């Protein structure tokens, strides 16, 4: 079963170089052993060091980029409307499109994935008002995380986020049962 973590709205702007703190700030139940590992190739875009716990944030790649992304998100943010409008598939077909349609008030929930818990977009999203994220690791992957972003100011937001996670759990269970089957069987 997925144990997603909902970010807590006490997320404070990052004013530390402690890489462990910034991840625990948005994903408190991350396993301690995660920080004893060497940064993977995707983490290395944002941090440098022998282990994640001893790493330093890269100024341009993480700190400045997060600041730029947060400023952009704030300009695109709008209060939640009473009724959501239909969106086109193209609007939400990219990670940015997925979270952008949520923060701009076009829909109550979206999902995307990141390749690192140090991804600046993830940290910027967690600082927006009335926006929350649930984070869980993708099955069969040591570095992909699924982010379910939703609006707290809409009753549909967390409800849809929880339903998405429930359906994802079912998919995981089915894929586990079919793990030894041929790809053709898995498609059906």
Swiss-Prot record:
User: Could you say which protein family the record assigns here?
Assistant: Belongs to the NleE/OspZ family.
Primary localisation category: secreted
Q: What does this protein do?
A: Inactive effector protein: in contrast to other members of the family, does not have the ability to inhibit host cell NF-kappa-B activation. Probably lacks cysteine S-methyltransferase activity due to its inability to bind S-adenosyl-L-methionine at the C-terminus.
Quote the cellular component terms of the Gene Ontology held in the record: extracellular region; host cell cytoplasm; host cell nucleus
Q: Identify the keywords attached in UniProt to this record, alphabetized.
A: Host cytoplasm, Host nucleus, Plasmid, Secreted, Virulence
- The protein here is known as Inactive cysteine S-methyltransferase OspZ
Compartments reported by the entry: Secreted; Host cytoplasm; Host nucleus
Q: Which organism is it from?
A: Shigella flexneri
Concerning Pfam families, the annotation shows: NleE (PF20798)
